[in-house]
């Protein structure tokens, strides 16, 4: 009997259940997302906010406590509104009363971290937002430090970065930020209120900053609508900024798979390469 069972086993064939068309689409989509994730610029994938802070040299700094390392960093918040097809341009606020200690005690500074949190946004807006930061302290445009981030409109958006060059107090008006929204579905105000969160390193001496040390992390659009609730603002840095920046690392949004347009960090300071991804690179050949 044992021999007959063995012979029947040897003659048997393994049956394969072909994936349905819907199941195959899910598998293909999962593979495309995994490949796109591995090819994200600069960080080659996701890292935690603690890892990002370490890579940026911000280990003592925490979004949850503005008093941490307060003698080296200061934090300010600005708010403004953005209209469709118009560029909202503003300068960083560096007035002494904004910070723990007068900025005149630290005449040199550089932007270390920045996060943008959209509080009020038209829910059905479907445009593209471009965020641009440029240091116009230099006469030669090729020497200017410029960063540009582009993403589809979402409830919230956060960016963590580090600009290499220091700025003097006299140059405070040369650091310009512009936000523009390209959206044909909205005629007027798209974002009714935005909070701009700065973390800036201060020093008594003009420390030499190498441009090729600049690191920029692109953060995904956030889908958590609860972050816009007024109750979240009882403790801004803990409940809003930290949640926005930390949650962005775990987001699963892949806008580059849905359109031919280029999203993410599309312009870096010079000497910082950006990995260009073609449509074929993010598609998996089965």
Swiss-Prot record:
UniProt subunit comment: Interacts with the rice proteins DJA6 and HSP17.9A.
Keyword flag Transport: yes
Gene Ontology terms: biological process: transport of virus in host, cell to cell
MF term (GO), any: RNA binding
Protein name per UniProt: Movement protein
Pfam families linked to this entry: Tenui_NS4
InterPro entries, alphabetized: Tenui_NS4
GO cellular component, one term: host cell cytoplasm
Record family assignment: Belongs to the tenuiviruses pc4 protein family.
Subcellular location: Host cytoplasm
N-terminal signal peptide: none
Disulfide pattern: none
Task performed by this protein: Transports viral genome to neighboring plant cells directly through plasmosdesmata, without any budding. The movement protein allows efficient cell to cell propagation, by bypassing the host cell wall barrier.
Protein source organism: Rice stripe virus (isolate T) (RSV)
Keywords, alphabetical: Host cytoplasm, Host-virus interaction, RNA-binding, Transport, Viral movement protein
